[in-house]
């Protein structure tokens, strides 16, 4: 079960809001629920007869970001959001010195999800101001052990 999401449209993501994605290669087994144009992914690990109590997934994110035209240059930060809260353990930060200059950010996190429970993940702008996002790309997959 690996799934890929992206967005070819540039978007302005307000502070404390999620990056929006379209389906590229969605999960065909119904384990990842996502609607086109949404920023929230609901993960539903399958319940099995095994003693497994949790599932671990590797979540990878990459995008180009910039301060919008007319904005004040300063640090840009994004984090994964787990069930609505920004996870401060993995934060991508870059500091453009001029507006509209593109910089790359990347996030990677191993997320543990209890079997039988749903967990929502997203990519959240935690900058404190609006940020332009170009070509966001998200992959959700089981880790290779």
Regions found by a protein language model. Name each.
Residues 1-145:
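Extracellular jelly-roll beta-sandwich "head" domains, especially the C-terminal globular C1q domain
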């Amino acid at each position: 079960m690996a799934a890929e999401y992206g967005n070819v449209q540039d978007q302005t993501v307000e502070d404390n809001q999620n990056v929006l994605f379209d389906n590229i290669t969605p999960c065909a087994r119904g384990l990842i629920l996502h609607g086109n144009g949404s920023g929230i992914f609901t993960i539903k690990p399958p319940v099995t007869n095994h003693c497994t109590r949790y599932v671990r997934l590797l979540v990878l994110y990459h995008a180009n970001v910039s301060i919008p035209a007319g904005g004040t240059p300063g640090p840009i930060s994004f984090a994964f959001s787990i069930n609505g809260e920004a996870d401060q353990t993995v934060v991508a930060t870059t500091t453009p010195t001029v507006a509209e200059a593109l910089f790359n950010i990347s996030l990677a996190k191993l997320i543990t999800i209890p079997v039988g429970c749903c967990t929502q993940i997203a990519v959240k702008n935690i900058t404190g101001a609006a940020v332009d996002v170009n070509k966001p790309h998200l992959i959700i997959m089981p880790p290779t052990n």
